[in-house]
Amino acid sequence: MRISDIAKRARANLASVFKNPAGTYRQLKRVVRAVLGYARGMLDYPAAWFGLSRPRDELAASVAELLIVGFYGSNTRSLSARLLARQIHRGEIGGVFFVNQNIGSIKDVKKLLRLFRAGPNQPLIAVDHEGGIVQRLNKSHGFTQLPAAKRVAARMSPDEAQKLYTIAGQELAALGFNINLGPVLDFDNPENPAIGKARRSYGVDPERITAYGEAFTRGFASAGVLCAAKHFPGHGNSVTDSHHGVADISTSWTTAELEPFARLFASPHTPAMVMIGHLRHDSLSPDEQLATVSAPIVTGLLREKLGYQGAVMTGDIDMDAVSQLMSRKHAIIQALAAGNDLVMIKNLFGYDPLLPQHVVRWVREAISQGVLTDAQIKAAAARVRAIRQRIGPGQADP
């Protein structure tokens, strides 16, 4: 992103503050943080661009598989997008994810996807494409507008939903995306700010949630787009939104919220990935850690008790729920130690052009200190490579 683009966005957000001070103050504060962090990060940009002193051993290659990273801007003029593409091409980073601010015109999206896919290493390219208000590519981009999950469950059978999701998957795959960050398997609670109020849940009956979750997974997978079921172990009954702080489910969560995950894992269409929510549950995690960095939840509950064998991914660790509690370094290392395979890092607040080099160094330190093992990193990388093999070369438009 150019400095002029940052200034333009900052002015737009400043104008919105005067229209709605209470609703946009937080957004403005985030923009200021992003601008300052970007400016500081640019000091390391030349070293990152030329790959000075970048590690090239087997451990570094494994760590690269585990990183799925965001970028600034919505077109190929973005300096961070260009650097991220270069790091993907050199094998320093394994994936990229798009959020709202990365989606401009369909022409710009196509150019960005070509930029990321241009090298020898084909990245994981992820986007939220649930439907309703969580659909980054919509009718304005020539995409089928998907209803929110709650409406799908109310008006369609699972078979009808699967046909709709298949069409949506074909549209994503044709553009070049290969990962959809969905389906949502959380329970519906109308008071929940993150799930219920946005109508992102299929209901409260585990069997019904599973049926539509399977339709979602099966439809997108049939088009070559793999899915990440979320938000384990269940975000639906929280009273806060993890985008803006810790979502404590210690007193509101019930074991029934595990059932949609367990049922989908036992189906013929197990999702390739599961996303861990930035959720706190003091009984499930006696060390009072967020689920994202909790070995009892990621390894003990998800892996061992429910038997999930696919790849486990974090939500964006730069979200407030995590960043307010720990440094990026601590979050990455603890997430990997807990059993996650993919770590999502927006790299927006505190932009770090040398992120891949830093993560490799942090992992080496953690291995030397006994926090991680070389075998853990290799096993996680192997699960991510298995996902790549299922995706194939893709069908992006020229």
Locate the predicted segments by residue:
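Active-site mouth loops of central-metabolism enzymes
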Residues: 68-79, 150-159, 245-254, 318-325
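Second-shell residues forming the walls of enzyme active-site clefts
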Residues: 96, 104-121, 208-367, 371-372
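Glycine-rich, aromatic-flanked loop segments that form ligand/cofactor-binding clefts
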Residues: 117-144, 161-188, 209-233
